[in-house]
Amino acid sequence: MAKHVKVAVTGAAGQIGYALLFRLASGQAFGLDTTVDLHLLEIEPALPALKGVVMELEDCAFPLLRNMVVTSDPRVAFNDVNWALLVGAAPRKAGMERKDLLEKNGSIFAGQGKAINENAASDVRIFVVGNPCNTNCLIAMNNAPDIPKDRFYAMTRLDQNRAIGQLALKAGVDVPSVKNMIIWGNHSSTQYPDFYHATIDGKPATEVIRDKNWLLNDFIPVIQQRGAAVIKARGASSAASAANAALDSVWSLINTTPADDNYSVALCAQGQYGVDEGLIFSFPCRTENGVVSVIEEIEHNEFGQQKLKETLDELREERDAVEALGLI
């Protein structure tokens, strides 16, 4: 039987939105057996640009794209949707402190959480791309009390994909050879790209890449700082790679994970690995028959434990900051 999905995308006229929508409409997230409605949300000044994007979507004549809704009203955008991809966020500007960014985005994501809570379909799932995505997700989740907490996710797949790419380059192998590359914690420069548990052609990555100095002192900082490096080189933040990672994430959350692999996504912690219950923290996950679960039996060496502590401390600080602002 043919399947149908209604998907809301916020910040739909932005760079990531532009890189995302055409691939969503062509079936790359939900499969070639699923038709799609797109509910596109933008701020009022961006609606003319969004109408141009809609014209282009129409001009692609995608067989799977059924209907499009264009709006600046979150209640309309989230009406009856099965997936809400929260891409739009206020960018960090020069001289802005992280807490200023948390406050500005906090009000956006609190409002969107409420609108999703009141208007979305009963099976809605929420995937946050807009940064700081872990804490934006936390805010949306806490403003949508009727939606189960296990339906909220934030994106660390871009970090995972970046890490896979770098390990493949260093080892001189094709990308599919690299598996089980885990990102722990926050999508920020404190994240822990865990090469210790990655595999290359079925062997531990540390056996294939013997250069421990590179792994510790080049690989980890490169992944942690990759977003900033892209901005410096391109003059704009990662857009196509972020959209690609969002599609990868949705696919992984829906489809059964291959037996020899896992994927990273930030979700609501339930005490795994000593992470506070209710924090949005990136873990290694698997999907089996549509059920997403955290892999819990991974052991960390002293280095890994320290890295987990650093990223957990940052997420606690962000939570405390938005709590003090009354956003959760």
From Swiss-Prot:
Coiled coil: none annotated. The keyword Lipoprotein does not apply. Pfam families: Ldh_1_C (PF02866), Ldh_1_N (PF00056). It catalyses: (S)-malate + NAD(+) = oxaloacetate + NADH + H(+). Its EC number is 1.1.1.37. The active site is at residue 187. The keyword Electron transport does not apply. Keywords: NAD, Oxidoreductase, Tricarboxylic acid cycle. NAD(+) binds at residues 11-17, 105, 112, 129-131. One of its GO terms (biological process) is malate metabolic process. CDD domains: MDH_chloroplast-like. Signal peptide: none annotated. Transmembrane segments: none annotated. GO terms for molecular function: L-malate dehydrogenase (NAD+) activity. HAMAP family: Malate_dehydrog_2. NCBIfam families: MalateDH-SF1, PRK05442.1. Belongs to the LDH/MDH superfamily. MDH type 2 family. This is Malate dehydrogenase. It comes from Coxiella burnetii (strain RSA 331 / Henzerling II). The lineage of its organism: Bacteria, Pseudomonadati, Pseudomonadota, Gammaproteobacteria, Legionellales.
